[in-house]
Amino acid sequence: MTTASPATTPGIAQPLARYAAWRRAGDMVFLSGIIAVDPAASRIVRGYADIPDEAATLIGRTGEFSSDIKEGPILAQSWYVLDRIRQTIEAAGGQMSDVIKLVQYFKHLDHFPQYSRVRKLFFPGEPPASTVVEVTGMLPTADILIEVEATAYLPLR
C-alpha cells in the first residue's frame, strides 16, 4: 500500500515543486529532501535568530558575534531540518528512533562536524545508516547549506 502525505501536516513546509513531502510504502516511510525553509514565515533559516531561543542555546549559540556568525547558519539549518524530520515522522505515527537511513547533502563538507553535533541531539542512541554527499548548490537559493532525506521503518498498525 502506498499513500501520499497529508497536504496539511502542521508546521511542515510543502515541497517547492510537484512532489510529495513524504510517502508510505507498506512499513516504510520515505521523506523527500528537507531544507531549512520556515513555512509559516516564508523565509530561509539563516541563523540563530530564525529558530527558537531554547534550540539556539542547545546547539551552541555563544553570544559572541565572531563565533555565532560563523557557525550559526549551519547549526541553525541543521537543527531546523532535523526538527522538521522529527515532526514529519511523528505526523506519520512514528518517532526518531524509527528513522533507519539519512542521506545528507552539504554545500560544504566542512559543515559536517557541526551538523553531526546537532544530529546527536536527535539520535542520542544508535544512529541511522547514513550517506553524506557534497553538492554544488540547492534550491531555492545559495543560502541553503544542507538538505536531508530520511527513511523510516514504521509498521502499519
Please give the residue ranges for each predicted region.
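N-terminal presequence-like segments and the immediate start of the first folded domain
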Residues: M1-D83, Q87-K101, F106-R157
